């Protein structure tokens, strides 16, 4: 009967007898009922509690890590997530790595431990960037976007090779067979489409700064990791260059690895990765990730994980349905964020995140809060350049790129003052250049005095140091 799969041998009850047998179908029923009982024991936390939990889970703010090893761990957790290039260092890495320096990222890239890929251009010089651990890059890389290849594109491929068939890393001048400007344009088209990568992040920084070389700041000291001997720069060359290299094409370029074609292998890896990234994996979070096969594919894998005891399915966060998955230890940590569980937690704790940051649950695991006076022309979204300010897990403000338009979601004046203080701290830290608020909820900010609710928001900004200008309220 055991050979036929009708009986299962194991240790099912506490007893001296080592040999215990159970009918296979009865065991399945017991397992299902045990899992159901386990789910019923877990009281769901509020959505605000989850919004407090997620940034801390991703090491934002007080939970920040440090050093190059810490940055490597952050990249492991965020592997494959498209992030606006303009937000990568000041708004995503810096809040997670307390001593972050650009040299740390360049060290990981130069060592080959980490690679980066483009995931689409945005307006101007910005674009979406994803990072990958070298050992698992094939499992987190997206399939490159299809573009119409020109002779310049094909000439680059002739040197670099195609994805999965890289011929090595080459300097820009080794790629040039015609006009340098044409090759530069073609190279960046391949970068944003996800075909080509570089061994330094310097070209992306140069592109974001308009192609200028950083000339006024003293370069940071190399941030070598502990327990590692200093390594030589990969871009040192035996023969000096006679002409300066355009900073937007500096370093060496190579073809990216090919993405893993086996959907089952990718689904299993993605399920583990997303559990680690989100703590509690929900349908909304999975949909925002754009996983091939969607949540339906992940659900099958996660159900298998549950049966194997690798995770739990339950109703962990209220209002998000019963199809939620988490590791048991994660659920225990989530419950420490229950409303009122920690009376010593300071009220009005604010955190500013890039709207597209995976640590922002709104617009992904959680829906954007509704606004009674919603303006069709100003809606929140996980957009490049946009910011969200969360106070005690509640979305208080949504700011468009540069702060031009600010949407308020709170009637709590103290929460808004905390939000304004967090924005002011972001500017004073130098992580962003400045903020100019021109509109509040679609109304010119200089007319806020005529609207009591908007006046509270404007006053909070002024109290935080924003100055009145002919265009609006500015802080820099």
What kind of region is each of these model predictions?
Residues 2-476:
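Long, charged, low-complexity, helical-prone intrinsically disordered regions
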């Amino acid at each position: 009967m055991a050979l036929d799969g009708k009986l299962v041998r194991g240790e099912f009850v506490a007893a001296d007898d080592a040999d215990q047998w159970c009918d296979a179908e009865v065991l399945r029923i017991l397992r299902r009922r045990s899992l159901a009982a386990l789910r019923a024991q877990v009281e769901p936390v509020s959505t605000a509690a989850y919004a407090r939990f997620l940034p801390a889970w991703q090491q934002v703010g007080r939970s920040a890590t440090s050093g190059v090893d810490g940055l490597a761990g952050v990249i492991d957790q965020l592997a494959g997530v498209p992030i606006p290039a303009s937000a990568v260092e000041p708004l995503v890495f810096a809040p997670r790595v307390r001593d972050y320096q650009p040299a740390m990222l360049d060290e990981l890239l130069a060592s080959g431990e980490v690679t980066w890929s483009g995931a689409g251009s945005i307006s101007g010089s910005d674009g979406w960037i994803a990072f990958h651990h070298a050992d698992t890059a094939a499992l987190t890389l997206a399939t490159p976007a299809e573009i119409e290849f020109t002779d310049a594109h094909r000439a680059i491929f002739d040197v670099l090779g195609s994805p999965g068939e890289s011929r090595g890393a080459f300097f820009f001048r080794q790629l040039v067979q015609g006009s340098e400007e044409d090759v530069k344009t073609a190279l960046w088209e391949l970068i944003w489409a996800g075909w080509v990568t570089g061994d330094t992040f310097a070209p992306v920084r140069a592109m974001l700064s308009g192609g200028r070389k950083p000339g006024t700041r003293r370069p940071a000291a190399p941030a070598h990791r502990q327990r590692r001997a200093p390594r030589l720069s990969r871009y040192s060359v035996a023969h000096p260059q006679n002409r300066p290299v355009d900073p937007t094409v500096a370093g060496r370029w190579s073809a990216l690895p090919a993405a893993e074609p086996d959907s089952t292998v990718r689904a299993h890896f993605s399920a583990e990765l997303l559990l680690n990234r989100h703590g509690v994996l929900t349908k909304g979070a999975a949909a925002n990730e754009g996983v091939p096969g969607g949540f339906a594919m992940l659900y099958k894998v996660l159900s298998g994980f549950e049966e194997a005891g690798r995770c739990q399915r339950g109703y962990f966060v209220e209002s998000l349905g019963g199809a939620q998955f988490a590791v048991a230890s994660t659920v225990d940590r989530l419950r420490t964020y229950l409303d009122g569980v920690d009376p010593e937690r300071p009220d009005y704790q604010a955190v500013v995140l890039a709207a597209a940051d995976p640590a922002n649950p709104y617009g992904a695991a959680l829906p954007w809060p509704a606004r009674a006076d919603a303006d069709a022309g100003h809606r929140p979204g996980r957009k490049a350049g946009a910011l969200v300010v969360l106070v005690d897990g509640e979305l208080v403000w949504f700011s468009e790129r540069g702060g031009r338009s600010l949407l308020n979601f709170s009637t709590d004046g103290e929460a808004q003052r905390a939000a304004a203080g967090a924005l002011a701290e972001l500017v004073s830290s130098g992580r962003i250049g400045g903020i100019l608020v021109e509109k509040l909820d679609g109304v010119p900010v200089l007319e806020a005095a005529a609207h009591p609710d908007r006046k509270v928001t404007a006053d909070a900004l002024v109290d935080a140091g924003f100055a009145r200008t002919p265009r609006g309220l500015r802080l820099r």
